[in-house]
């Protein structure tokens, strides 16, 4: 009888361990390349608003690919502004040379921009400093979320 209980307990431990490991693999694949979001599962959504989600700024390349793919002006330059502290220029490194040449980064000169990108990482508190406020002549065209957590947003100028 004690041997059966021990074998049964060992099987339960193995099954629970296996479920935990499988879940970890699943979440890492689901969140790739934003694996740091795995830890957000331990917090509620209200708390996650207080933390940087895209701290390595991986979303820049993804947002730039989206902008290029959705732009109708094939031969012209695309002017991209940045409403966050994260520099955009090195986000283009994961793009082909042809796509890189289409992009012109204008910093926070929103008047020159066709698109504005933000990953909500700011140098200062936006409650008091409106450096990154999106102008009224831009409209939101993309929200990228994982598990209802906003990673980045792209705006397009209204013509």
Place the predicted regions along the sequence by residue.
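Membrane-interface junctions at the ends of membrane-embedded or membrane-associated helices
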Residues: 1-18
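Catalytic lumenal/periplasmic loop and adjoining terminal transmembrane helix
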Residues: 14-156
């Amino acid at each position: 009888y004690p041997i059966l209980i021990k074998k049964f307990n060992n099987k339960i431990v193995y099954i629970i361990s296996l479920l935990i490991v499988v879940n970890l693999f699943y979440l890492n694949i689901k969140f790739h390349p934003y694996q740091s979001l795995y830890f957000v599962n331990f917090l509620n959504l209200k708390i996650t608003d207080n933390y940087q989600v895209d701290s390595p700024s991986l979303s820049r390349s993804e947002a730039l690919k989206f902008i290029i793919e959705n732009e109708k002006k094939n031969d012209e330059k695309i002017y991209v502004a940045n409403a966050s502290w994260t520099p955009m220029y090195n986000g283009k490194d994961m793009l082909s040379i042809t796509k890189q040449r289409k992009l012109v980064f204008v910093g926070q000169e929103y008047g020159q921009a066709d698109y504005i990108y933000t990953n909500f990482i700011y140098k200062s508190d936006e409650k008091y400093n409106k450096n990154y406020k999106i102008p009224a002549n831009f409209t939101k065209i993309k929200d990228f979320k994982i598990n209802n957590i906003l990673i980045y947003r792209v705006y397009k100028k209204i013509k």
